[in-house]
């Protein structure tokens, strides 16, 4: 029987914080050092867009804690209006975070530019990007069906506004905040449910918490002084390693220096409620973010996961694919509601999960905002083809199931894991052992 044991010190740096650190550095006056920047394709796309829009970006490898090699990024800027007109469309590849959040910055620059991406990104909805920026005074043009390319005619005369987000979205909240930094006056962003709050934490923005909403206050045209950033390990990447340990009985794994921001690590509480053998140790605060070690000691398995609370869904939206596959394989059951946002990710993740789980013999039923796994009616004989839909989280979720259970799965376009987890397979090999 295959089990997984060891100490993980090479988990990818947090993708969300890496994006934001680079963008905030480009808006700051002076030189910013970002330690432990992500090597994932998405974060490298952000650096590429910054370079091609005139920002000085340097990247090098340095020795860090636990003897690991990490990336240090150094970004030099003169402040809010340091960008220059690009000579070609800005390529975001597969990174929706890059395309959406950079739109907010570029809408405030006095030139025209275009943001493009790969085939998957060019299908994703961008109207939610255009609407607030148009209200602030930028000219934004999309394709007829509301997708990229995003053509931006920016202006230094952006207006502040009060904007209520129609759905919880950390990317849309952040792009408005980045645009608002350039505007005259004070902007207020109202979110009905809390989304990940890295932008507020990193910029030190005031947040007003009311009964049914949160208000983020962004003062306009404030000087941002360069400051260093340290990027902790990505909790979304940690979820895959946790699932690996929980699916393979007898596994013992420690994951070091993981971001435990409550808006990112809520899935840990969910798993604890399901009687999963996990714990947290060595908690501390670095750069405003809670960081700690996650311990996995799997002796008893877990109970089925049923997810419906809208706030919880907003917090764990990226981890749902892995949690669904984990619950299905470990218990034969899973239930999800209020997660329609999953249909607008790198793939329609509800459809992708249901299609692949059905191929593996699970009885599933999907709804507009979720799906249910009722039971496993058969275990297919021989190798089963899994369709990744060119989505890194779908590919990794089923790869974890294959590694932990020994089932033979042939996953299409498996190289897509490099979007967020370049050392995914090498890390699994390091942890693998025979019981």
From Swiss-Prot:
The keyword Calcium is assigned to this record: no
Binding, phosphoenolpyruvate: 15, 96, 124, 171, 349, 393
Annotated localization: Cytoplasm
InterPro entries documented for this protein: Enolpyruvate_Tfrase_dom (IPR001986), Enolpyruvate_Tfrase_sf (IPR036968), EPSP_synthase (IPR006264), EPSP_synthase_CS (IPR023193), RNA3'P_cycl/enolpyr_Trfase_a/b (IPR013792)
Catalytic site: 318 (proton acceptor)
Keywords tagged on the record: Amino-acid biosynthesis, Aromatic amino acid biosynthesis, Cytoplasm, Transferase
GO terms under cellular component: cytoplasm
Listed Gene3D superfamilies: Enolpyruvate transferase domain
PANTHER family recorded: AROM/DEHYDROQUINATE SYNTHASE, PENTAFUNCTIONAL AROM POLYPEPTIDE
Family assignment from sequence similarity: Belongs to the EPSP synthase family.
Protein name from the UniProt record: 3-phosphoshikimate 1-carboxyvinyltransferase
Species annotation: Chlorobium chlorochromatii (strain CaD3)
Higher taxonomy: Bacteria, Pseudomonadati, Chlorobiota, Chlorobiia, Chlorobiales
């Amino acid at each position: 029987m295959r089990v997984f044991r060891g100490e993980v010190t090479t988990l990818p740096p947090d993708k969300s914080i890496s994006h934001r650190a680079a963008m905030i550095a480009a808006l700051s006056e002076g030189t910013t050092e970002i330690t432990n920047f992500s090597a994932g394709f998405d974060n490298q796309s952000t650096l590429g867009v910054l370079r091609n829009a005139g920002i000085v970006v340097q990247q090098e490898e340095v020795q860090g804690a636990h003897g690991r090699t990490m990336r240090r990024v150094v970004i030099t800027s003169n402040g809010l209006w340091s960008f220059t007109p690009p000579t070609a469309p800005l390529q975001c590849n597969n990174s929706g975070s890059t395309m959406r959040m950079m739109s907010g910055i570029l809408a405030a620059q006095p030139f025209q530019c275009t943001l493009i991406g790969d085939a998957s990104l060019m299908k994703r909805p961008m109207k939610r990007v255009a609407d607030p920026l148009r209200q602030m005074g930028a000219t934004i043009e999309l394709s007829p069906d509301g997708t990229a390319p995003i053509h931006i005619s920016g202006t230094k005369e952006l207006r502040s506004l009060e904007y209520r987000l129609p759905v919880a979205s950390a990317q849309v909240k952040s792009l408005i905040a980045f645009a608002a930094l350039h505007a005259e006056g004070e902007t207020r962003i109202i979110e009905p449910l809390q989304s990940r709050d890295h932008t507020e934490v990193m910029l030190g923005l005031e947040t007003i918490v009311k009964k049914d909403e949160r208000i983020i206050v962004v003062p306009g045209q404030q000087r941002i002084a360069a400051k260093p950033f340290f990027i902790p390990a990505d909790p979304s990447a940690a979820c895959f390693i946790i699932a690996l340990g929980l699916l393979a009985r007898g596994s013992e794994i420690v994951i070091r220096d993981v971001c435990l921001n409550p808006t990112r690590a809520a899935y840990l509480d969910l798993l604890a409620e399901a009687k999963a053998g996990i714990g947290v140790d060595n908690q501390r605060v670095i750069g405003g973010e809670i960081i700690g070690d996650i311990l996995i000691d799997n002796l008893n398995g877990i109970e089925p996961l049923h997810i419906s609370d809208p706030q919880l869904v907003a917090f764990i939206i990226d981890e749902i694919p892995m949690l669904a596959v984990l619950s299905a394989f470990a218990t034969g059951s899973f239930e999800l509601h209020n997660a329609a946002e999953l249909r607008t990710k790198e793939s329609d993740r509800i459809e992708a999960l249901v299609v692949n789980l059905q191929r593996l013999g699970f009885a599933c039923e999907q709804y507009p905002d979720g799906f249910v796994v009722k039971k496993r009616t058969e275990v297919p004989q021989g190798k089963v083809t899994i369709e990744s839909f060119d989505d890194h989280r779908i590919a990794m979720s089923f790869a974890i199931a294959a590694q932990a259970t020994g089932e033979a799965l042939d996953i299409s376009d498996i190289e897509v894991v490099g979007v967020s987890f370049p050392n995914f397979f090498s890390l699994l090999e390091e942890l693998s052992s025979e019981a």
